[in-house]
Amino acid sequence: MTLTQLNAFVLVARLGSVTAAANALGVSESAVSQALSALRLHLGDQLVTRGPVGMKLTPGGSRLLPTASQIVVLGAEAHAAVRAAQGAPEQLRVVSTSTIAEFMVSPLTEAFSKRFPGSVEVSAGVAVTKEMSVLVANRLADVAISSAIPEDPGMALATEPIFKYRLVVVTAGQPRLRGGPRQWLWFVDPSGTDPGSETGQLLTSLGIPEEQVRVFPNQTAAWAAAADGTGVAPAVEHLVAQRLRRGELSRVDAPGCKLDACWHVTLLERQHQSVAASSFRRYLGTPEAMHLMRSPAGGVPPSRFRPPVYVTIWS
């Protein structure tokens, strides 16, 4: 029984699939399956089985999960302790939705890093909302920025609001829409496929059929498609403001086509936070950070980011 095997089991159990666990770890599905199979063989129990709506824990798996989670956490803390003893920079791993990654994460982390030159090593990743609490709780990320994450007392996390904004719907400067929202083509970035994101919530509230949704690599590409006049795109109002002023896009003022929302930050509870994570949380409340979230200088496509990986547990 190894740390690799226990980590694979915990992520499959928490995230509900081998695919999601592999994505979180940045490894292949076969690597996760092999680790899980080895653990099953060692313990003589299936631990998790495939059910009608995801993976289901066996009685043995249910008893193993809290203990395995503690061991995974201790392994991550041991890795961090050795890095610190070697004088390595402290890690700050930020995970967010694709929209936040495109516009916010790079300006925020670059400005934060300048305050601690050489002492903090920053990396970033993209995940869907339901995965973020698992990534933070299992020390695969230090900070998550997203819509509000459902509370799970067993994960010992703290979630706080950091920035209010409005989600609107935009289309071409000279609108050519026909029918109602359910008849329009909707252009979204990857967060539009995340039911927990504000974009996902907007599409659900409007009852948009899946066949009317087109997914683009990033938000900027979705806006460009909407500007061509063939459909609409959800947009964070203050991020799209310049395009609205230039007349490239126009707001769609139809019932249900706006949503007041808030970005939240999720970390471990205070007593478990790393120095870098708690410092970054304080930074997010500064005037500089507020300005960057309100008026970021530029975006970085989500393709620049990868889910954070604990390579050491697979070596």
Per-range role (PLM):
Residues 42-43, 64-86:
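Alpha-helical linker/hinge and terminal dimerization helices associated
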Residues 40-59:
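A short LG(V/I)-centered, amphipathic sequence patch enriched
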Residues 10-28:
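Short helix-boundary/capping micro-motifs
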Residues 89-152:
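Central regulatory/effector-binding core of bacterial HTH transcription factors
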Residues 127-184, 239, 313-314:
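Acidic, Gly/Pro-rich loop/turn segments at junctions of secondary structure
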Residues 127-132, 140, 147, 207-252, ...:
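Hydrophobic hinge/microswitch elements
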Residues 182-209, 274, 290-298:
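Secondary-structure junction motif
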Residues 177, 253-308, 314:
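A late-sequence structural motif
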